[in-house]
């Protein structure tokens, strides 16, 4: 009912397009004040597929506006960007998400976006681009300027109309990503050394004063891989603190923060990851509360490798490899260094 009234109108839409869980307080959803809230995870929404990432929801919204305006096909240029966001946000790759990624990958080499073409060329892909490439190579480059300087650098790349200027912008963005990776390695090493000074608790809460807040989530993910614990990395941000968390199965990060929300000024996230802000004087209280509320067992702190069946070496032929390659998009590549 809403869409027809928006087409051709001057109405301002302030939307909440994200895949994070809706925060709760006293049994009520905490929703922003907005003209329109676009969030399939809110209780009043009956959209059948709630696993879309923020960019996926934005793409669906634009698609519907184009469709109702009679501009069919105009959305195709946006599919590679929706695919990149879907992979980099590590949402489940089934249903609509799988369709978005599959169609985005199919069209990425034919994109008319000069900036995206320049970035692909600079990264020197020798084979067709896969979902893993979106998560491990293209996505981190796009995110790097926003982590270290200004996210508009990536936006300007994709809005560039001159091929030579686009090539220069792409080179700078790739260089920025290399700088970001070096900072991440340094901070991960420093954090790991700090963690190893004492017996491992079930939840790691690490304060890194010198860590840039934009790489805190990557550092948390690296520590999670190294120690197999839920990890919160907290950094300075002006006169307060900001944190980013990465989790393991069995520990719902958003719910754990919700249980400790009296120590926080803001928080949001989902089972696997979260972000939050707090006042400096609340740091020790938050640490204690997170540890006290954690119910992980020792068994849950041991990483498990699951598989469907054992495969004999004689079964591994090119036919099987080709068949398995069809299942690639059902995995969720986790962007990292």
Give the residues covered by each predicted segment.
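N-terminal small/polar loop signature for handling phosphorylated ligands or for N-terminal nucleophile
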Residues: 9-10, 14-30, 38, 224
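Generic detector of well-ordered alpha-helical packing
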Residues: 19-20, 40, 90, 144, ...
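Short alpha-helices
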Residues: 29-71, 75-87
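Short, ordered loop/turn segments at secondary-structure junctions
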Residues: 19-22, 41-43, 209-210, 236-239
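A contiguous loop/helix-start segment that scaffolds small-molecule binding in enzyme catalytic cores
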Residues: 90, 110-114, 293-332, 336
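Hydrophobic helix-and-loop "lid/oligomerization" segment in the mid-to-C-terminal part
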Residues: 33, 67-284, 288
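Alpha-helix capping and helix-loop boundary segments enriched in small/acidic/polar residues
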Residues: 9, 23, 45-53, 91-92, ...
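Single conserved hydrophobic/aromatic residue that forms the stacking wall/gate
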Residues: 1-8, 13, 330-337
